[in-house]
Amino acid sequence: MKQYLDLMKHILAEGVDKSDRTGTGTRSVFGYQMRFDLSKGFPLVSTKKCHMRSIIHELLWFLKGETNVAYLRENKVSIWDEWADDNGDLGPVYGAQWRSWPTQSGDAIDQISQVIAQIKSQPDSRRLIVSAWNVGELDKMALAPCHAFFQFYVADGKLSCQLYQRSCDVFLGLPFNIASYALLTMMVAQQCDLALGDFVWTGGDTHLYSNHMEQTALQLSREPMPLPTMTILRRPESIFDYQFDDFELTNYAPHPHIKAPVAV
């Protein structure tokens, strides 16, 4: 994906060196946007191999409303292990906020069910938003939400989605985030009988960690391959009934995987 490589080049050329919470150090830019036409292929980075299995299982885990890593571990996905406590708990992270945002009255709001109902009944609404940034519960979360909120947009029978990501690890995290929200958009579009529009990614503090520079240079030396195709093989009754085997990725011919340390 040229857009992703262009972002890396932009950070290297225009970014500033900053300290960060992890003590690793970053090169950072503030405010950046990329747009992907989902009708032209699935936006999965090809200049290194991405683990689509982890991306799918993490998204299904979010949609289940779960915040314990047990489901992920059962499916050999370890991307949240560094932040989990001894019992595998992460506090009220994405799944909790998406599916059961607590209200002052003691009720809970299922934002995913709500936004799908709104897309179907009020497609021109400007309030088709899901937020994970619950200020009242940030201190209970193992990690504050990086991909903080997203908005759907319906026009000409097509569904688009824009994600705002307040903090972005460009080398390790961003390929996952783009693919995850592109897939979520496909699922919601199917549930709402809409064609695919764009996925728009907007970043706040968008950075390369200082210990990812060699890996970034290697990735920039590689030529992007054509976009693969993601097919949803089945339409379940609801957004919450998808299974891992419902998704088929074809024509993905990436360059080899590049290892890099995670900043915790």
From Swiss-Prot:
Role according to the record: Catalyzes the reductive methylation of 2'-deoxyuridine-5'-monophosphate (dUMP) to 2'-deoxythymidine-5'-monophosphate (dTMP) while utilizing 5,10-methylenetetrahydrofolate (mTHF) as the methyl donor and reductant in the reaction, yielding dihydrofolate (DHF) as a by-product. This enzymatic reaction provides an intracellular de novo source of dTMP, an essential precursor for DNA biosynthesis.
Question: Which Pfam families does this one have?
Answer: Thymidylat_synt
Binding of dUMP: at which residues? 21, 126-127, 166-169, 177, 207-209
Q: Where does this protein have coiled-coil stretches?
A: none
What cellular component GO annotations does this protein have?
A: cytosol
Q: Which NCBIfam families match?
A: PRK01827.1-3, PRK01827.1-5, thym_sym
Query: HAMAP family under this entry?
Result: Thymidy_synth_bact (MF_00008)
Named from the GO MF annotations, one term is:
thymidylate synthase activity
Q: Which UniProt keywords apply?
A: Cytoplasm, Methyltransferase, Nucleotide biosynthesis, Transferase
Please name the InterPro entries in this protein's record. Answer: Thymidate_synth/dCMP_Mease (IPR045097), Thymidate_synth/dCMP_Mease_dom (IPR023451), Thymidate_synth/dCMP_Mease_sf (IPR036926), Thymidylate_synthase (IPR000398), Thymidylate_synthase_AS (IPR020940)
How is this protein named in the record?
A: Thymidylate synthase
Instruction: Provide the gene name from the record.
Output: thyA
Q: What is its EC number?
A: 2.1.1.45
